[in-house]
Amino acid sequence: QHPANFKQVLAGQLPHLGLLVSGGNTLLFEISTAGVLKVLAETVDDAAGEALDKGAKLLGIAYPGGPQVEKLAQQGDPHTFDFPKAIAPRNERRFSFSGLKTSLRYRMEKMTDAELEAQLPNICASYQKAVIDQLLGKTKHILEVESYQSIGLSGGVSNNKALRAGVQRLAQRYKIRCMMAQAQHTGDNAAMIAFAAYADPTGTNTSEVNIAPSLRLDQFC
C-alpha cells in the first residue's frame, strides 16, 4: 500500500523502513515512531522500473517490458553476464540505473542477432539481477546502521518475484516484520488510493498540494 496515516496502519511496527520501486520512483524512506516520513535515498537518474522497461526496449521486448524481462529471466542464468550494479559506493545513499542501460547497449553491440536471440533469457536474468542487487544492497546497508521494527515494499515493481523474495530474506535476517501488498494488487493504483481512504476514515490525514506529476513522497507526508 502507498503510505497513508502511518501511525494507524503501522501500529507497533515503527520505526519502519520502506522501499518504493516503480517506473517513476525509486527511493528508500523511513517512518519514525512519531509517524514522520523521511526520504533516505533516491535515484539520481532513471527509476528501477524505468531501467527495466528501457532495457526491454533495447532488447526488442514488447511493452510492458519489466514483466516480460522477469518472465524471460526465470528461464535464464543471472550469472552469465556481469552488468554494473551501481556507480556509487555501497554506503552512499543514492540509486543510479542509467549506467546499467548503457552497459546493456554496449554488450548488445558485441553480439550477433543469433547470439542475442540465444542468450536473451540469460541477458534478462543478468540485467534484472543487477537492478535488484542494487536495490537490496542499499536497503541492506541502511538496515546495518539503523534499527527498524518493520520493512515494506511498494510500487509497481514490487510485483517482481525475485525482489519480493530478496526483501523477505532481509526481513528474516534482521528479524523484523515484512510488509508488502499481495502481488495481484501491486499494480492497482485505484486500490492503493482506496486503501488510503480506508486507513483514514475521518479524513484528517490531508495536505494542501497542487498537481505535481513528480511530487516527492516527503513533500506531502
Regions found by a protein language model. Name each.
Residues 150-151, 168-192:
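Conserved phosphate-binding/catalytic loops in two-lobed NTP-binding clefts
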Residues 1-3, 181-219:
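Glycine-rich phosphate-binding/hydrolytic loop that grips phosphoryl groups
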Residues 22-24, 151-160:
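Glycine-rich beta-strand-to-loop/alpha-helix junction loops that act as flexible
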